[in-house]
Amino acid sequence: MQEILIPLKEKSYKVFLGELPEIELKQKALIISDSIVAGLHLSYLLKRLKALEVRVCVIESGEKYKNLNSLECILNSAFEMQLNRHSLMIALGGGVISDMVGFASSIYFRGIDFINIPTTLLAQVDASVGGKTGINTPYGKNLIGSFYQPKAVYIDLAFLKTLEKREFQAGVAEIIKMAVCFDKNLVEILETRDLKDCLEEVVFQSVSIKAQVVTQDEKEQNIRAGLNYGHTFGHAIEKETDYERFLHGEAIAIGMHMANDLALSLGMLTLKEYERIEDLLKKFDLIFNYKITDIQKFYERLFLDKKSEDKTIKFILPKGVGAFEIASHIPKETIIKVLEKWH
């Protein structure tokens, strides 16, 4: 069992990487999962969990259910179980479950503990660590949420055996995101080695990057923004396609392609660097046939991104390989020219 400490001022915790251990709790625990994950992995967790009382809340699977209705379902289950401030919630699932359970925990009785047990690669390397929680609204993605850290995170790679290839690749997109912005060495590992042979090493390294970034910038005031590479465009893509056509990681991959195009046009990437990042995305089949239906509407959606300030869109763009820059005040014409490539 490998451990990664995330030392924060208000709430430090550990990420455990290895076979899920027996978890003994002296309080009530509400497990929240989705309809697919519960069928695959709930019994595995229940065999390893001992608590004063355990109940399960199952919600529908998918990004489109990351909404107020599902949040209300979680909170109602907590009230019906009579959870108190000493109780906790357990998130068993992917990024959608992790985000919603974290948010529910942050507002129930003004905050109770929760544990993340991520079952997708995307959630293991990204969503379950760092304390970003939230739900989507008709206006955009994650526009209601909070920064709220888990009590602990348990990453068991055995969960990934049931993942479809598409889900796995979506998680790889988030790994590439971190590598391109923060770690040249990880880029080289992804370029030169078979991921199946080094998956545990790559997951450990990805979580370590996330841990270092979150430790330095928990509330996303500066360096943590680098974790949003591809997200300004990606969130607009998800909204345009009603959260149904693409998985989150797939939309982020398309967003990274767009960000690369913008970085190249601004001279932040050389053609060689641009092609290197593009080739890495292609290696993992993160190439998609996507066309923007209405460029002006798409452009306007970019302003709903949480990073936007004073009617200015902020983009996280790669600056070479292993670094990034927060770019703002980019002329509309420059952005539109990039979008036209995808029209």
Curated annotation (Swiss-Prot):
Binds 1 divalent metal cation per subunit. Can use either Co(2+) or Zn(2+). Zn(2+) binds at E174, H231, H248. It is found in: Cytoplasm. Pathway: Metabolic intermediate biosynthesis; chorismate biosynthesis; chorismate from D-erythrose 4-phosphate and phosphoenolpyruvate: step 2/7. Its EC number is 4.2.3.4. Its cofactor is Co(2+); Zn(2+); NAD(+). InterPro entries: Dehydroquinate_synthase (IPR050071), DHQ_synth_AroB (IPR016037), DHQ_synth_fam (IPR030963), DHQS/DOIS_N (IPR030960), DHQS_C (IPR056179). It catalyses: 7-phospho-2-dehydro-3-deoxy-D-arabino-heptonate = 3-dehydroquinate + phosphate. Keywords: Amino-acid biosynthesis, Aromatic amino acid biosynthesis, Cobalt, Cytoplasm, Lyase, Metal-binding, NAD, Nucleotide-binding, Zinc. GO terms for biological process: amino acid biosynthetic process; aromatic amino acid family biosynthetic process; chorismate biosynthetic process. GO terms for molecular function: 3-dehydroquinate synthase activity; metal ion binding; nucleotide binding. The keyword Transmembrane helix does not apply. NAD(+) binds at residues 61-66, 95-99, 119-120, 132, 141, 159-162. Catalyzes the conversion of 3-deoxy-D-arabino-heptulosonate 7-phosphate (DAHP) to dehydroquinate (DHQ). PANTHER family: 3-DEHYDROQUINATE SYNTHASE (PTHR43622), 3-DEHYDROQUINATE SYNTHASE, CHLOROPLASTIC (PTHR43622:SF7). Belongs to the sugar phosphate cyclases superfamily. Dehydroquinate synthase family. This is 3-dehydroquinate synthase. It comes from Helicobacter pylori (strain Shi470). The gene is aroB.
